[in-house]
Amino acid sequence: LHLLAVRVAVLGFGWAGVLAAGFLLERFPGAEVVAFEKSRRLGGLLSSAEVNGFTFDVGGSHVIFSNDKAVLAEVVALLGGEALEHRRRAYVRLGDLFVPYPFENGLHVLPPEERAELIGDLVEALMKIPPGWRPRHLLDWIETTFGSGIARRYLIPYNEKIWKRPLDQISADWVYIPGRLPVPDVKTLVKTAAGIPTVGYVENSRFYYPRRGGIQRQYQAALERVRDKVAIRAGEAVKEVRRRGGRLVVNRVEVDLAVAAMPLPDLIAAFSDAPEEVVKAAERLDYNQVVVVGVALDRPAPDQHWIYVPDRRIVFHRYAWVSNYSPSNAPPGRSALIAEITLPRGVEPDLERLKAEAVEGLLELGVAQERDVLHVEAWLHRYGYPLYTLDHAQNRDAVLRWLREQGVVAVGRWGQWHYWNTDKVYKNVKETIAAL
């Protein structure tokens, strides 16, 4: 592309969209960039809300970490010295025990017999893996890699809870994204079996978080770089996209190029002339909604960051003490917690009921007592987690191929339909814009 005096549309202005605008302006300083965002409020899944002196990350628990040192340095640099560094204190709640995360590193806290059984299963499973094995689906990957004990106690119930689907209907593709799910290593297992603490999943064993303003500050820092140079149409959803000659028309705005950072099904629905097979492929892209329940507590937080909860009786799959991410997220002596609940697409959530169930779950786990609860809020994101169904790759490829032919480049979690953290999104957007 020879882009100097060119007009580019950015479709969707969450984390991927705001980064795309920034990289476009660096690459083509003369470009005119117009951004469409359906929400009046900017931030996407990196949104935070302040309620009575408590700050909640309303898109779920997000922290800054990466196994890519350059990406990590760039994202932390965005915060301009306003980033706090933490050593991860994450746990899996098993019965009354807090097992340090990753689970296979944390088993040293279990009684010796139980430890021996789970690690015995795991080693046996690893010894049986044939060379060149590829998992047929997520259930196959869990059972083959971790053995029946860890699968049954933790990974199956936890993953069924977050994905809300039978695990033999979820592809194992996403566990091949390096840095997405920790896989056990034998020396670590021997130490764990002997009851020696070890650290796993080193990429996020240290993480960063904004000093003030919640995780939204990460988004704001990227926004501040482009705000004066981009025409941001907040509260304007992408309703219509069509080709006119060699250009694209987005909601009646004519552009030379579009960078899509919005959910693919909504984008394809905006094209009146998309071929039927592309429309069908986009409709088959599955996802879960996420409801985030924020709870303000009149007590200090324990020395923990986030906790995975495989227990099927509890509605949320994870809760996080966001006031431990930054002390400015709660008044002194009090704490702010968020609990995350997924729902299949198309389900109309009853937020009042989910708030009540989340509080019940926290009481049941002994995380809080009724008298500690000051107030409870809930936020819904229709697009929470992209799902890796078994036909995910072919549907995604069909949609992306057709979009490229139309002159639309797709980026980010929702444009690429990948379960990416903010670091993977950063790298994807940067590389995509550099290749234009």
PLM-predicted stretches and their roles:
Residues 25-51:
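Glycine-rich FAD pyrophosphate-binding loop
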Residues 70-103, 146-152, 225-234, 239-249:
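Feature captures the FAD/FMN-dependent oxidoreductase FAD-binding
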Residues 6-35:
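N-terminal Rossmann-like FAD-binding beta1-loop-alpha1 element of flavoenzymes
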Residues 16, 41, 265:
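Conserved Rossmann-like nucleotide-cofactor binding loop
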Residues 27, 236-352, 356-366, 400-402:
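Mid-domain catalytic core of redox enzymes
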